[in-house]
Amino acid sequence: RNMSGLYFLNVGKTGSGKEHANTVIEDCLEAADAMHLRGPSGYTSSSAVLSALQEKPSHIAVIDEFGSMLASASAKGNQNKKDALTMLMEAWGRQTKTLRNVGYSMVQMTEAQKKSMQIEIKSPSLSIMGMTTPETFYEAVGAKDVASGFLNRILIVESKRPRELSRNPDQIDVPKIVTDWIRQVSTTQGEGASMISDQGNDFPPVPQVIPFSEQARTLLRDYEITITDRQNTSSPMIADMMNRSREVAMRLSLIVAVSLGDREISSVSAQWAIDYVDFYLRQTLEIMDVRISEGDTDGLRKAVAESIKESGSIGVKMNELIKAVPRLGNLKKHERDGLLAMVVEDFPVERLV
């Protein structure tokens, strides 16, 4: 089965308005009396993920400074944050199954204590809306995050718009058509089932099935072929980032179909989802190929090459390059010369002395 929970990430410059998504989500849920669907603003451990889902098996978490959370999880000694990301990965793929906690030693525990340690959430439905700046995000992630499978579960949308003057739009209430839709969709179940608010983590609601049309299946199959062909000609890191693109498109097509009120996922919904996912996937891959590295040296090498590339045919002087890539100035002269030699060898760059 294909469920609708997705992880989204807004990437934009400071002050670009990427936080507006949080405002819209909160305003709409509050107007529809559906704040019970609003989850925490982050997770500190795997137990925190499970506890939140145990209390609210279906919720959306809005996480500001998502890049900082990833950086914290990558820091040495922060195993709890690493475990939280692992549990988020598992929750993404367990929406039709059961999410369980990891095992702990239960020696000398009473039966009541043992029972309290065993947490199971059937059919958890977790959605995440993250926000971050490009600098924080791309400095926090590395090839290992792609290989682990965490990043390819996220639909990353980076805004390329330049900074703009603020606007003063009129304040309006959330339209009734929106609040009515939220109430309807958040309580929709299969025939003969009770209301979603009556359910707990042990009794998931009976889902309403929205089937794929034959035309939609064909489009998704063609997209899978396209993805596979790209993977076969890409580096391992880039290929790994495409592993779940088709599944993300399937989930998004379900969301589009439900938003349109359709009883079937049509070719229109499927094509829209494929186009949306693929556009931002290709944008993300292009950026990651330059900005995500296998280590500190690789990251610095790519940053220097990108800075030289941006200077165009006029080139860039050493003092300008150090200003653009401050980490280069921290190197000793022989280290810097060695790094520049790698850049000249690996990229279409010429050094004139």
Q: What is the meaning of each model-derived region?
A:
Residues 1-353:
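Phosphate-handling catalytic cores of nucleic-acid transaction enzymes
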